[in-house]
């Protein structure tokens, strides 16, 4: 993979170079000391992946991510030494299309390969997303008599560009929105709590992490909060599970959507927002085949038109909509 590093700190650049050296297939093709330089270098030589710092002179990583995704889109991972202090910037960058975030690898520890492992895993996942994905088995639905009834649910999946899209969608809903909402966003567990807090503050909706064993409820927006998948169980409660182990993204949107197909017998709407790859497309199709309304974000309003495009390609979405129209449509569905 051809990789670029955008960072103004020589020690951080060296740490990233050393980490990447453990995987011979990775090649650093250029290094930029600020965001403005990175924008220009990306025009001249677009890499497969950019490792982007947040705090830099001239142009920061948030604006650089926005410019690059608009002009020469490629995969971007945010690399930071202080994720808690930079949490808002992290989610702003992800809103512009950054795929993920990882800590800067440590230099000088007793096990440099172990220190490099989190970064290398992120890159492996992104490399997989840029390739082809095999089809999933179709879900087998359970009869209505075998499950307990729940009333109204909105199941939302998002990835790259998701934080900003979720903020816009949730801002468009009133506090008394008459349906439970569960969000599955591709974000590492260490950032999930910060994302829930940020979404709560930015959108004005009560957003928190979903707890094992709780039931989706009206008036609360639940965000999948671990590196395991989240599922709806037969009794209507939520559970985290390591299975299936072969899913690259954890939590998987497909896994949650398919569990909704099996066990939710009230009204439900599936929404698939911006993101790279195909996660969520098959699950959305299963929801449509179950008789639920399914909505995919349109290309023009998507930061990364990957997952919604995959859904549209297999006719998984009943409706394809601009982002700003999705909240009003949900209100229309649940207030008739």
UniProtKB/Swiss-Prot annotation:
- Gene source species: Pseudomonas syringae pv. tomato (strain ATCC BAA-871 / DC3000)
What InterPro entries does the record point to? CheB-like, CheB_C, CheY-like_superfamily, Sig_transdc_resp-reg_Me-estase, Sig_transdc_resp-reg_receiver
What is the role of this chain?
A: Involved in chemotaxis. Part of a chemotaxis signal transduction system that modulates chemotaxis in response to various stimuli. Catalyzes the demethylation of specific methylglutamate residues introduced into the chemoreceptors (methyl-accepting chemotaxis proteins or MCP) by CheR. Also mediates the irreversible deamidation of specific glutamine residues to glutamic acid.
Name where it's found: Cytoplasm
Q: What is this protein called?
A: Protein-glutamate methylesterase/protein-glutamine glutaminase 3
Keywords of the record: Chemotaxis, Cytoplasm, Hydrolase, Phosphoprotein
Query: Which GO terms are recorded in the biological process aspect for this UniProt protein?
Result: chemotaxis
Any single GO molecular-function term of the entry would be: phosphorelay response regulator activity
- Give the gene name: cheB3
Which family would the database say this protein is a member of?
Answer: Belongs to the CheB family.
